[in-house]
């Protein structure tokens, strides 16, 4: 059960990235404040995410095959997670100006690629920690915890950073500091709640 919980906590952790960056707060910020206009912003964002999906579809199977042969699953999960978190931090520098359009799309695109690649190897571990008859329950538990994590971090970001007149840490709404700070929240959330899984990954992967 401990392995299942640690596994699910990773879902709880990484849901912050898709919820805040890809789907809600940062995508809206990009469309309204960085792109020339919201319509173009949504289009650019959608194309970027679509392209990352194609990239992952191409290189994912190749990396998967390599990982199986060289036993690199553990390494890939850790390194891709760290890269995604690091890139997410860089979104703090995405100021509300068209000058940061390409920068933001590049960072988001790369972060999403490494996020999706980490999931390929993460999902492959489930069969090692759960009996075949319980795969559905284990997967469902992980999905539910991930969904819960996304809701919680969204509420935190909205109440503390977006719809709050008294911002923490000396932040101001000038230059959208409050919105950009949510990228740091995501990175910290992702890192902190992924630690139990990452630190026990060798044991989990070896199914000891």
Predicted region positions:
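Membrane-embedded alpha-helical bundles of multi-pass transporters/translocases
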Residues: 2-202, 207
